[in-house]
């Protein structure tokens, strides 16, 4: 089993009976001599989706779990269920709307590239999205001429219903790139 100082973002731990995906790691080096380096880790509980924070010393032993990751494409909606199809063997993976409610805000009609399903021991656990999503602005206040890139922001509604803050110079109909984890504007889409 690896030590806490060997854990990387994206790994999955079995901790206190929960499966936790590592989302972020902050390393805190103490100023006192002989004190251990602390690793403050932010997790997402695979089963419930709740955010969890834990602290470990660098030499603490942790139990890692190997999940199976499969690339999928969005296939169709059947009532309250969303079906994703494996890109290699065409296995369907079905999620309820409640299971992937947060992820649906970033998935445009027709799907997006690089989506993955996480399975463990044959059990479907989660849908993992890439770091960014390209979405179209469907509603925002009119663009202001002469507004610079560093000026104020305004709310904009995306094609999926997501509302984020964007620079004032953007207008309805433009495609923008959004950082999914931080839910923030990154720039215009290519």
Swiss-Prot record:
GO terms for molecular function: translation elongation factor activity. GO terms for biological process: peptide biosynthetic process. GO terms for cellular component: cytosol. Pfam families: EFP, EFP_N, Elong-fact-P_C. It comes from the Bacteria. PROSITE patterns: EFP. Coiled coil: none annotated. Belongs to the elongation factor P family. PANTHER family: ELONGATION FACTOR P, TRANSLATION ELONGATION FACTOR KOW-LIKE DOMAIN-CONTAINING PROTEIN. This is Elongation factor P-like protein.
């Amino acid at each position: 089993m690896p030590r806490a100082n060997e854990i990387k973002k994206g790994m999955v731990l079995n901790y206190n009976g929960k499966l936790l995906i590592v989302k972020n790691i902050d390393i805190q080096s103490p100023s006192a001599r002989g004190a251990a380096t602390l690793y403050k880790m932010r997790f997402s509980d695979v089963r419930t989706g709740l955010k969890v924070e834990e602290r470990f010393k660098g030499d603490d032993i942790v139990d890692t779990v190997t999940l199976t990751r499969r690339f999928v494409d969005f296939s169709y909606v059947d009532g309250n269920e969303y079906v994703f199809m494996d890109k290699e063997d065409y296995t369907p993976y079905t999620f309820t709307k409640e299971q992937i409610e947060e992820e649906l805000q970033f998935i445009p009609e027709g799907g997006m590239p690089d989506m993955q399903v996480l399975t463990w021991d044959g059990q479907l656990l989660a849908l993992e999205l890439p770091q960014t999503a390209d979405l179209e602005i469907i509603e925002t206040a009119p663009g202001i001429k002469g507004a610079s890139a560093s000026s104020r922001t305004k709310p904009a509604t995306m094609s999926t219903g997501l509302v984020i803050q964007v620079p004032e110079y953007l207008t309805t109909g433009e495609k923008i790139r959004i950082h999914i984890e931080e839910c923030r504007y990154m720039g215009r889409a290519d």
